């Protein structure tokens, strides 16, 4: 379908009908197949939240470029962006950080709290998956573990190896704090 759309005037991509455009398609024989099975893009919303409208726009652009896999990075040390109903603190606590790293030395932040309400409900996640599927795009939602879990550990410190205290990271890089694989509560958390 995208190859056919590309043969039509650019107005095919507009949201409103265009009446002053000639919708003519040249006679053609199309032999079009992807070279690679996996043609994807990655979007990191754990560190910077975009919201539903932008994610759908991203998927629209992916469709135009015949990409078929959306790798959606939803959790990391800097923020938790997906609702898990059994663990509400993941979003009420884990989505919030006290600032964002803005300098190359990684030790200074802008001091501006970030993340209030910046997460997706399960219904919104389903909506994005359905929207993507209608465009022939598979969604790979990423939840990092056992590392890159400071947002989760801030919400549930008992899941860590040290018990904390933890805070949602305002830096970039790799934290030493991870989920404790030897902790039975951690295993229950992962199963849920």
Task: Show which residues each predicted segment covers.
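Feature activates predominantly on carbohydrate-active enzymes
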Residues: 1-177, 181-192
């Amino acid at each position: 379908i995208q190859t056919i759309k590309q043969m039509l005037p650019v107005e095919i991509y507009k949201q409103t009908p265009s009446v002053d455009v000639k919708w003519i398609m040249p006679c053609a024989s199309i032999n079009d197949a992807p070279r690679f099975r996996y043609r994807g893009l990655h979007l990191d919303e754990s560190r910077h939240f975009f919201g539903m409208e932008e994610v759908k726009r991203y998927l629209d652009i992916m469709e135009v470029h015949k990409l078929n896999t959306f790798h959606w990075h939803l959790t990391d040390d800097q923020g938790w962006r997906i609702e898990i109903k059994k663990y509400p603190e993941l979003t009420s606590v884990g989505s919030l950080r006290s600032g964002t790293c803005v300098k190359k030395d990684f030790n200074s932040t802008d001091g501006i709290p970030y993340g209030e309400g910046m997460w997706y409900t399960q219904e919104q996640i389903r909506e994005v998956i359905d929207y993507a599927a209608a465009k022939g795009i598979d969604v790979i939602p990423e939840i990092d573990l056992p590392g890159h879990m400071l947002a989760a550990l801030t919400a549930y410190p008992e899941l860590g190896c040290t018990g904390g205290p933890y805070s949602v990271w305002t830096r970039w890089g790799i934290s030493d704090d991870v989920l404790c694989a030897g902790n039975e509560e951690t295993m229950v958390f992962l199963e849920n």
